[in-house]
Amino acid sequence: DRNTSGIVIAGKNSEALRQINEAVKLKSIKKYYKTLVCGKIEKSGRLEDFYEKDSQLNKAKVGGKEGKIITTIYRPLKTNGRYTLAEVELITGKSHQIRVHMASAGFPIIGDVKYGNKQENEYFRKKAGVKRQMLHAYKMVFEGLKGELAYLNGKTVTADVPKDFKCAEKEIFGI
């Protein structure tokens, strides 16, 4: 998603891109995100739902009876009872997946204008200058890669959260 910060993976040429796409499909590249959400997440969970996307409205929905199955795993890292810093692992990778899945589970992402809570977003805009969703691709783990990408096996790439994320985190947890 355009307003998500963090690691972006790209291929230098069409063959490298094909191999990356194949590796993602085979789960040889694992993607992890940090997010700040409304609500108290007490324990780890796994979300699995049918996913549909309306391309004209550029909006996704989950929980119907048809579409593609998507899977998202989440783990609470820290909570104050009202908000939670969570790690999210993408098992499937659809557009808006984390945002729509977390919102449907009752944990909308702070700053998400499409699936989030308007009042909470306004509060964080005023108090911490939040102008985008607090979703950050912070880690990629490479394992089981073949061919030209095999040199990445066993490697982990990480990216620190940006300043706006830290400001929102400070507002919540006083860090």
Where are these regions (language model features)?
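Glycine- and acidic-residue-rich catalytic/RNA-contacting loop of pseudouridine synthases
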Residues: 17-22, 36-85, 100, 144, ...
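Polynucleotide-recognition surfaces of large bacterial nucleic-acid defense/processing enzymes
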Residues: 89
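Residues embedded in well-ordered beta-strands
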Residues: 34-36, 139
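Pseudouridine synthases involved in rRNA/tRNA modification
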Residues: 101-175
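Glycine/acidic-rich beta-strand-loop module
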Residues: 1-26
